[in-house]
């Protein structure tokens, strides 16, 4: 079964070669749920995303339309985009919700239409077990919350106190 990725690349101005005056910009469409692992070959891991990201050079435009997903996978993608050598422009097509909002923060520039939405919320999980297990889940969620606030704080320059998620 062929993998169905939640992203795909398009190289702008097909057939045009890179020059110092007109470098080619690659376009990444990141659509759908962000996942850490593929269970049914319908998601792709961050490692495969990294391989494709690093397969080209130059500036990139990321068109983002995602309801979010796994925050740890989103964190990996955020880090890959932040470490990318070219300029990263994030364009929120319609929705950057939940973990996708973390990916958006990796852009050197973030652009949204007046109709686009960004949803930021407290991280969620499913937990089962006794009171000790529940406390561990609460502590883990608190750590995740603080880590994603780091991305928002770094991008906006707003103090942590401004984020009431």
Model features per residue range: what roles?
Residues 1-99, 106-165:
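N-terminal organellar transit peptides
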